[in-house]
Amino acid sequence: MHSTHPYIYDVIVVGAGHAGCEAAHAAARMGCRTLLLTIDLDKLAHMSCNPSIGGPAKGHLVREIDALGGLMGRVTDRTFIQIRLLNESKGPAVQAPRAQADKRLYAKVMKETLETIPNLDLRQAMIERIILPRPINRNGSDTDDAEALCPGHYAVVTHTRRIYQCRALVLTTGTFLRGRAITGDAIWGAGRAGEAPATALGEDLAALGFPLVRLKTGTPPRIDARTIDFSLTSVQHGSATPLFFGFYYRALNEAPPEPAFGGPPASAYPEPLLDAWRPQLPCYLVHTTPEFHEIVRRNLDRAPLFSGIIEGVGPRYCPSIEDKIVRFADKERHGLFLEPEGWSTHEVYVQGCNTSLPEDVQWAMLRSIPALRRVELMRAGYAIEYDALATGEIAADMSSRRAPGLFFAGQINGTTGYEEAAAQGLMAGINAARFVQGKPSVLLRRDEAYIGVLIDDLVTKEIREPYRMFTSRAEHRLLLRADNADLRLTPLAGELGLVDRERVAVVERKREEVERLLAVLRGKRLYPSAAINARLSAAGIAPLTGEMSAEEVLRRPEVRYRQLQPALDLPACEADVAEQVDIEAKYSGYLLKQQREVERLRRMESRRIPPDFDFAALRGLRNEARQTLQRFRPATIGQAARLAGINPADIALLLVALERQTRQATPVETPHPSLPHTG
């Protein structure tokens, strides 16, 4: 028999990876008594694969998480050993920070942070069963004592038979559901190397009727820095100027985050930057060789990816090294980055070399690279197969379409990447709390956030492989820059109780300051004169040849506000304000064009489809369209239009049916775009 003394919470989060930590933190901050359960509290927020956070689109997600009061950005700022701004030579839409974190310190700081959050309890336990408020399609045991559970509550059963109850349940199980690890012909049950899989929970979800698919991911070998010839590598340093993921440290009277590590770095790494604005370690670039490729080709018959041992579908945009060599046979070499896994460890991550080849092959292929002739492997690479939900199981608020109050986030939804998981976890935690509080769900549109793009893609697209975020997936990416995530999202975070009033006030002051300076620039007329041109030339700005406004001068590609400010006696401002002024001035035409397109599309998004709308009864609809709409159950006309196989004629029929339904019922008021909307 299970324990008859269950603990009762508002929200329970199962799994304490990047999704689970953000979900639990958000729910607790919003006033819900929350429990975070994980198999191993020492591995909370563990970086199972690469020791990096951010990059194009992923860095955008981290900035958005921070703007919404999440943790990932600020924990990274305390634990990174290197940070860079990627795509610095390109436009602002694709520029994004990327950091190398000390992976063990990241987990330590995240755990210490969560331990200080009111309303949040942490417990170590493996969950084996879920009891639904109203069990559906269960093929399992009849011994569940549902009568002992509070009405309307979920229950989770641990491996020690403890029962915890909650009104909203969030599953963030990562790669643990019936996970198995694979290196060559060696196969063992694992959620990741060294940790047991959640086999019973995977079987229980299947018994409850949730359709599951098998996905695959992989990780490269880790090597010993003391056995690398760094003189044969290319060194890649971090940023020479201060750069963080978190917004407003100074404005909130918070000291810039000091590194959580101290003392000298591991002795093996050459050229550490110890006296700069922040101690940093370099990364190091090497390339594969013809011998490397030949070793891989010679052993393809031993590769689980090609022998049939691996059944799960892997991420297209993060292929294994053996897959790259087969698919891109014409490429003579591939770049591999050697990334230190921490400040004081000699363990190095070989980025770009994830593999499930036999361990002896891994040794041989790495030792074919000149810088790695004497390299020693500390851990072999492996693939991991796991269960994930089939497409169409989640709604736009991250909830289950089958069971109200049940939410999913992270790799269980078919995504890959820490940042994608954290973003989903944040939204799942927010909406779990809103569910408990009887409030409407919060949905972010595609024009509001990369988080909105991510979730909309999960809801409206067939996910056949682990999903990864790219800037190219965001059609409004000039509006969704990493630099303006605070202006876009922090006011909403304030409404939800995720950040305090002071932080919202700082954002609004910044917005007002940007608008004020743009007005000053537009109103300041300049005429060619010896005095003006001399001042411009002294600032490194080409002289005037005709009358123009100061804003028009700033639109020149090479001119920056902080360069123009002293030359024209313009108001001084903080660097982040100047950055916004630069972008708003230089890209005003493009921004206006995108904003008009957003307004056009927003009218479609605002036309909501009732959750119980009967697509099967819609006359004239093609069978393919009817089946697709029934499967995905879009929440808005905009979502319906983005579904594969839905054409304009289908949308026209749907609009007519909704108009007819609206005339027959009391109209539902559409929420203001800036407020949370129902999902």
Swiss-Prot record:
What are the entry keywords?
A: Cytoplasm, FAD, Flavoprotein, NAD, tRNA processing
Cofactor(s) in the UniProt record = FAD
The superkingdom of the source organism is Bacteria
Subcellular localization is given as:
Cytoplasm
Presence of the UniProt keyword RNA-binding in the record? no
Short name of one Pfam family for this protein? GIDA_C_1st
Major localisation: cytoplasm
Binding positions for FAD?
15-20
Q: Which InterPro entries match?
A: FAD/NAD-bd_sf (IPR036188), GIDA_C_N (IPR049312), MnmG (IPR004416), MnmG-rel (IPR002218), MnmG-rel_CS (IPR020595), MnmG_C (IPR026904), MnmG_C_subdom (IPR047001), MnmG_C_subdom_sf (IPR044920)
Family statement drawn from the similarity comment of this UniProt entry: Belongs to the MnmG family.
Quaternary form?
Answer: Homodimer. Heterotetramer of two MnmE and two MnmG subunits.
Q: What is the name of this protein?
A: tRNA uridine 5-carboxymethylaminomethyl modification enzyme MnmG
Origin species? Roseiflexus sp. (strain RS-1)
